[in-house]
C-alpha cells in the first residue's frame, strides 16, 4: 500500500514550480515539434506493364494533389516501396498549383531531406521531406515537382489512377513557373502522402476501398470522388472543419487477395494505421472479390460471404486496437456489370446484411441504400450510374459523399 506524508507549504510551492516548468517545457517542445496530420494520400502499387512503366531519366515530374486540410507548414512523403533499386531524387520543390503545369507566383519552395537538396530512397522505403513554411489553404491544389536523374530503375512505385492530370518534362525544371513542353501523366509516381502541421483538433479520416473510392469514371481534375465530397462538407461543418480525408482507394483492389495493388488486409498497416492523425476510417471493399466469381482463374477466387466478413472484421478489429473508429460501408449495386452473377448478387446482399447488423463497426454508411434503383435494387439508380453499371457517375459520387452522416465524426 502506498504511504503519503504531509508535504507542507514548501513542498506545495516546489510542486507548483515543477508543474509550471513542465508545462512550459511541453509547450516549447510542442512548438518545436508540431503535430502532423495527413491532408492528402494515394495508395502506392507496383507498375508492371509497359504502359505504366516510364523511362524516367533526367526528367522532372510535377504532380498535383488536392489537399483537404490547410496548414502553415507542409511536408511531402516520397516512396520507393516497389523499387528493386535505390531511387534518387535530385531536386524537389513544393508550391501551390496555378492550373495546368503552372505554379502560383511567390509560392515555390525547395524541399530538403535532412538539410540536403537530394536524397536516395532505398528499395522498399519511403521518406519525408523536411518541413517547409508554406501557407496551404484547405481544399487547394498543391504542386510537387521533383527531378529524377538518369539511374537504374527496376520496378516503379505509383498510383495508377489519379483522375488528375500530372506532368513530366525534360531536365531539372523543378522550380520552373511553368514546365516547358510537358507531357501529361494520368498517374501519381513516387509520391504517396502530404502532411500539414495540425491545427487544434485536427484529425483524419481514411477511406479504404477499390475503384469506387478511387473515383473511377469521375470527371478528370474535378475532385468529384465521394471522399472529395465528404472533405468539402466537413469544411462547412462547425467543429469538424479540421478533419481531413485521405483517399486510399485502389481501382481493382480486393479484400482477401492481391490483384491491383496489395489486398486490403495486406495494406491496412501502411494505408490506415500508419497515417498521421488518423482517428476514423471507412471501408468500402469486397465487390471485386465477389466479381471474380464470374471469372474464376484459380481456387483463391472462390470466396464466400463468411470469408469476406472475416476479412472485414479483421480490418475493423485492427483499427479498434489502435484507437481508430471503424465504419463499414455497404456495397453498391452491380447488376448488369461485366462481372455480375446471380451467385455474386446474393453474396453482396449477404455481406451488406452482415455489415448492417453484425455490430462489428462503430457505424454504417449505407451506400447501397443511397445509390440503388428503388424499382430494381440490384442495379444502380439510373441518375447515379456512370453507364457501366458498376461505378457511379459524378452525381452518384456526390450522393454518396452527401449521404454520410457527419455525426459519425463528432
Question: What does each model-identified segment do?
Answer:
Residues 2-3, 24-208, 218-221, 239, ...:
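N-terminal secretory targeting modules
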Residues 2-13:
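Bacterial N-terminal signal peptides that target proteins for export
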Residues 11-21:
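Bacterial N-terminal signal peptides
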Residues 82, 150-151, 211-215, 250-255, ...:
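Solvent-exposed loop/turn segments at secondary-structure junctions
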Residues 204-209, 213, 243-249, 279-285, ...:
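Structural recognition of the beta-strand scaffold that forms the well-ordered cores
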Residues 215-228:
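Glycine- and acidic-residue-enriched helix-capping/strand-helix junction motifs
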Residues 218, 250-306:
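Oxyanion-hole/transition-state-stabilizing segment in secreted/luminal serine hydrolases
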Residues 265, 291-293, 331-410:
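Catalytic His-Asp segment of secreted/periplasmic serine-dependent ester chemistry enzymes
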Amino acid at each position: 500500500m502506498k504511504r503519503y506524508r504531509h508535504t507542507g507549504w514548501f513542498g506545495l510551492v516546489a510542486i507548483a514550480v515543477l508543474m509550471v516548468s513542465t508545462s512550459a517545457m511541453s509547450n516549447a517542445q510542442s512548438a518545436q515539434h508540431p503535430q502532423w496530420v495527413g491532408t492528402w494520400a494515394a495508395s502506392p502499387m507496383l507498375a508492371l506493364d509497359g504502359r505504366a512503366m516510364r523511362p524516367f531519366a533526367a526528367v522532372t515530374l510535377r504532380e498535383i494533389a488536392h489537399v483537404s486540410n490547410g496548414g502553415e507548414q507542409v511536408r511531402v512523403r516520397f516512396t520507393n516501396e516497389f523499387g528493386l533499386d535505390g531511387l534518387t531524387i535530385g531536386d524537389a520543390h513544393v508550391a501551390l498549383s496555378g492550373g495546368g503545369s503552372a505554379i502560383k507566383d511567390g509560392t515555390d519552395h525547395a524541399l530538403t531531406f535532412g538539410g540536403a537538396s537530394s536524397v536516395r530512397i532505398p528499395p522498399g522505403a519511403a521518406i519525408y521531406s523536411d518541413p517547409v513554411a508554406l501557407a496551404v489553404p484547405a481544399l487547394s491544389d498543391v504542386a510537387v515537382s521533383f527531378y529524377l536523374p538518369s539511374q537504374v530503375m527496376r520496378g516503379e512505385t505509383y498510383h495508377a489512377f489519379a483522375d488528375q492530370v500530372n506532368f513530366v518534362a525534360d531536365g531539372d525544371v523543378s522550380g520552373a513557373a511553368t514546365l516547358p513542353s510537358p507531357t501529361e501523366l494520368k498517374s501519381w509516381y513516387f509520391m504517396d502522402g502530404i502532411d500539414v502541421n495540425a491545427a487544434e483538433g485536427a484529425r483524419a479520416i481514411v477511406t479504404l476501398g477499390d475503384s469506387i473510392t478511387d473515383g473511377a469514371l469521375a470527371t478528370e481534375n474535378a475532385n468529384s470522388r465521394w471522399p472529395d465530397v465528404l472533405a468539402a462538407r466537413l469544411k462547412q461543418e462547425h467543429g469538424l472543419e479540421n478533419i481531413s480525408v485521405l483517399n486510399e482507394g485502389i481501382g481493382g483492389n480486393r479484400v482477401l487477395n492481391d490483384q491491383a495493388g496489395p489486398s486490403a488486409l495486406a495494406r491496412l498497416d501502411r494505408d490506415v494505421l500508419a497515417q498521421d492523425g488518423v482517428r476514423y476510417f471507412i471501408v468500402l471493399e469486397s465487390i471485386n472479390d465477389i466479381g471474380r466469381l464470374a471469372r474464376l482463374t484459380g481456387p483463391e477466387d472462390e470466396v464466400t460471404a463468411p470469408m469476406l466478413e472475416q476479412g472485414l472484421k479483421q480490418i475493423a478489429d485492427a483499427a479498434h486496437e489502435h484507437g481508430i473508429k471503424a465504419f463499414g460501408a455497404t456495397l453498391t449495386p452491380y447488376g448488369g456489370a461485366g462481372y455480375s452473377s446471380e451467385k455474386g448478387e446474393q453474396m453482396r446482399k449477404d455481406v451488406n446484411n452482415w455489415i448492417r447488423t453484425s455490430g462489428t463497426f462503430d457505424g454504417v454508411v449505407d451506400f447501397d441504400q443511397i445509390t440503388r434503383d428503388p424499382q430494381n435494387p440490384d442495379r444502380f439508380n439510373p441518375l447515379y450510374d456512370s453507364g457501366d453499371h458498376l461505378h457511379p457517375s459524378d452525381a452518384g459520387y456526390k450522393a454518396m459523399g452527401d449521404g454520410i452522416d457527419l455525426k459519425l465524426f463528432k
